[in-house]
Amino acid sequence: MNHSERFVFIAEWYDPNASLLRRYELLFYPGDGSVEMHDVKNHRTFLKRTKYDNLHLEDLFIGNKVNVFSRQLVLIDYGDQYTARQLGSRKEKTLALIKPDAISKAGEIIEIINKAGFTITKLKMMMLSRKEALDFHVDHQSRPFFNELIQFITTGPIIAMEILRDDAICEWKRLLGPANSGVARTDASESIRALFGTDGIRNAAHGPDSFASAAREMELFFPSSGGCGPANTAKFTNCTCCIVKPHAVSEGLLGKILMAIRDAGFEISAMQMFNMDRVNVEEFYEVYKGVVTEYHDMVTEMYSGPCVAMEIQQNNATKTFREFCGPADPEIARHLRPGTLRAIFGKTKIQNAVHCTDLPEDGLLEVQYFFKILDN
């Protein structure tokens, strides 16, 4: 690999001390994984070229948040023509929608998405109102099956995702297979609709046909104006909170973790991807400050990339789910509770795959923090 090749991005960092947005040039050298930063306003080097293992080429796309030495940077633009040419056409976004009939198979479908080289950049379990369903299916309103389509898409929760990769629209359509699941089982037996769908309407998942449809549909579910889009599905009863930590999301473990939670008999009644900032994480983890020696490392891990928060429902949810997660240290978990989430998916006491609520009285509060306060 060419060690002099570099990609340049314009990045912003919010300085909490000065309450200012500071702008930098971020240079990434894929040959040796090193980074360099220049202060745009003051025209000076902010960080000399330094090897940094936690930033990868696939993290570099406009709109993404990346962590460089504990600073959370938002990539807002390309820094030069070469970077724009090389990386601009490389990544394409599309909408992936898991329909009500396949919600119980969300783990399997997300696993297929990850294995196909997609990055999930947004995710939210939602309940569509009739009006939202009509807006979504506006292209089908002259079709004879239109009313059945609207009825079906509003019968239960859906999961909407923004997914990213080269040629995303075509690749996602290929993974889905033919629109009718019966046809898919004959013509594309390994496709998502063949595996998890029933017929032409109850066909497990959806993907837009064109760049224009993808843009229109993503705007419905994830408005660029900063609005919430359709409502989340949190019920705020008999619940506890689970968060799939950024390292586990980035390692492509989300699908496997969802399958494990379902197979253990828990109901995932709400789910959403969040990019937390340091202030939010410190607020959420406040109960651990001064109590847990790893507090600062826990905070840094939780805002190092996107995490996925869930509302988990079951009787005595906090206690039973905490037992299913296992001891905080995965090494101890592997010896004492080898079937638990942290034993199977955790790496270290900080990167232990999941956070779960510790105290029964905090279950509802933690769920409310994500699904009432942050999803606002």
Swiss-Prot record:
Tissue: Expressed in airway epithelial cells.
Quaternary structure and partners: Component of sperm flagellar doublet microtubules. Component of the gamma-tubulin ring complex.
Name of the protein in question: Nucleoside diphosphate kinase homolog 7
Phenotypic consequence of R322A: Does not affect NME7 autophosphorylation. Reduces interaction with the gamma-tubulin ring complex
Post-translational events: Undergoes autophosphorylation.
EC id: 3.1.-.-, 2.7.-.-
Consequence of substituting R322E: Abolishes interaction with the gamma-tubulin ring complex
Protein source organism: Homo sapiens (Human)
Domain DM10, residue spans: 3-91
Effect of K173A: Abolishes NME7 autophosphorylation
Signal peptide: none
GO biological process, one term: brain development
Keywords: Cell projection, Cilium, Cytoplasm, Cytoskeleton, Flagellum, Hydrolase, Kinase, Nucleus, Transferase
Compartmental location: Cytoplasm, Cytoskeleton, Microtubule organizing center, Centrosome; Nucleus; Cytoplasm; Cytoplasm, Cytoskeleton, Spindle
Domain note: Contains 2 putative kinase domains (94-224 and 239-372 AA), the first one is involved in autophosphorylation and the other may be inactive.
Keyword Ribosomal protein: no
Keyword rRNA-binding (UniProt): no
GO CC annotation terms, alphabetical: axonemal A tubule inner sheath; axonemal microtubule; centrosome; ciliary basal body; cilium; cytoplasm; cytosol; extracellular region
Recorded GO MF terms: 3'-5' exonuclease activity; ATP binding; protein kinase activity
Protein family per UniProt: Belongs to the NDK family.
Function as written in the Swiss-Prot or TrEMBL entry: Possesses an intrinsic kinase activity. Displays 3'-5' exonuclease activity with a preference for single-stranded DNA. Does not seem to have nucleoside diphosphate kinase activity. Functional component of the gamma-tubulin ring complex, implicated in the regulation of the microtubule-nucleating activity of the gamma-tubulin ring complex in centrosomes, in a kinase activity-dependent manner. Part of the dynein-decorated doublet microtubules (DMTs) in cilia axoneme, which is required for motile cilia beating.
Segments traversing the membrane: none
